[in-house]
Amino acid sequence: MHFIALIVAVCVAFAGASCPYSSGGIAAPPCPKNYLFSCQPNLVPAPCAQEAASYGSAGAYAEHIPFYVGYPNHQQVEQYQERIARAALIDGLRGLTQGIQDQQY
């Protein structure tokens, strides 16, 4: 285990000695002057949005707060099952009516 650590340390030392960190000879390009965001220190914050009359003082940032529903109670489950059964019955009656109309012609 110590041998592997020694080999890794030697490799790191050799790599550090063979790769000197010197600045390159390429200069940075000049700062652009006609862009919205540049490297010049004269940026100013954007102005605040005007108050919208229909939203009141909240402006356009008003949004509904989501809430999480819990488990449905027994009555809600029964109402849901009744609606599903009624929808299936209506769908079946539509199919039956369509079949009768197709047979008449």
Swiss-Prot record:
InterPro entries noted in UniProt: Vitelline_membr_Cys-rich-dom
GO BP term, pick one: vitelline membrane formation involved in chorion-containing eggshell formation
Subcellular compartments: Secreted
Any one Pfam family match given in the protein's UniProt record, by short name: Vitelline_membr
UniProt cross-references to PROSITE patterns, sorted A to Z: VM
Record's signal peptide: 1-17
GO cellular component, one term: extracellular space
Domain VM positions: 25-62
Main location: secreted
Keyword Signal attributed: yes
Key words, A-Z: Secreted, Signal
GO molecular function: structural constituent of vitelline membrane
Family: Belongs to the vitelline membrane family.
Function description: Major early eggshell protein.
Protein name: Vitelline membrane protein Vm32E
Lineage, highest ranks first: Eukaryota, Metazoa, Ecdysozoa, Arthropoda, Hexapoda
